[in-house]
Amino acid sequence: MMDELDKDQIAMLKKAFDGFDHEKKGAINCDVVATILRMMGQAYNAQTLKELIDEVDADGSGMLEFEEFVTLAAKFIIDDDAEAMAKELKEAFRLYDKAGKGYIPTSALKDILKELDETLNAEDLDNIIGEIDTDGSGTVDFDEFMEMMTG
């Protein structure tokens, strides 16, 4: 999970972790984890929190070392990023689905792809469209569009 976060995110988590590791033991307890998660907008009851911590507490100490803490926090950061991306892609799709039918013609998608990469020739575009329009309908629905954009 740590490799899915950028340097700034890891630095922010390190700062939060160090700030709550008052005794400088290199580990924080469950209560502190709960406080940090609340600060991140994530509130859980005691049982759910225990399950989350048990999931990432590799050494079973009941305390989270920094790497374990990052694994836990990354779940929320990555989920938030994925949600934001899905929302942006839905907006982009809606711009091209002017009639609101829930799909865009592959011809419109070709235009979009050409704008994104001017080096694509007709054969490249046909190959890409063939991969995206999995049902061969000549249209691309939101799920196909989402798959193309997120790979």
From Swiss-Prot:
What SUPFAM superfamilies does UniProt report for this protein, alphabetically?
Answer: EF-hand
The residue ranges of the EF-hand domain are 8-43, 44-79, 84-119, 120-151
Modified residues annotated as N-acetylmethionine in this record: 1
Signal peptide feature range: none
Question: Which Pfam families does UniProt cross-reference here?
Answer: EF-hand_7 (PF13499)
Family, as annotated:
Belongs to the troponin C family.
Instruction: Please report the name of this protein according to its UniProt entry.
Output: Troponin C, isoform 2
Which organism was this protein described from? Balanus nubilus (Giant acorn barnacle)
